[in-house]
Amino acid sequence: LFELQDEGYRVFQAKLMPNISCDRIIGVRTPDLRSYAKKIFQMPEAKEFIQKLPHDYYEENNLHGALLSLLYPEDIETFLAELERFLPYVDNWATCDMLSPKIFRKHLPYIYERIKKWLQSDHEYTVRFGIVTLLDFYLDDAFDPEMLSLVANTESEKFYVKMAVAWFFSIALVNQYE
């Protein structure tokens, strides 16, 4: 990852995530990180890497998220087990929001039940992940008005949860105006 480092981008990223020490940010741009994940996901080291938690760097967490989707594109049970093992280590909004697994599209009713559990978590970014997942996958034909109450009743004083709630309602208003 250090071979992909962009020092200016590192400084920029640090300003966007004040809760992450600059020493924990390498400065790898997301398209480069995703390309790297596609290069390595078939290597045995990829599965070894996702087994080692916690990671030291912000980009390692992002790589972890990218690898999950590549390693388990069809196996929802294994994907969810690995995702739920990883979520407690997500420590910032950017890593959280980068997780948008395409596999969810094939399992919307099943994932919706998981979202309800994630919204009850004590972990800020697990709750945010649940809200962002609703935003990413359920504000189209999968929408149910119950989702509005579900998000509105999310109990958290955490800043990044409140921001996700506001974001959800802004997109819901646009996509589901009635």
Q: For each of these PLM feature ranges, what is it?
A:
Residues L1-E178:
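Alpha-helical scaffold domains
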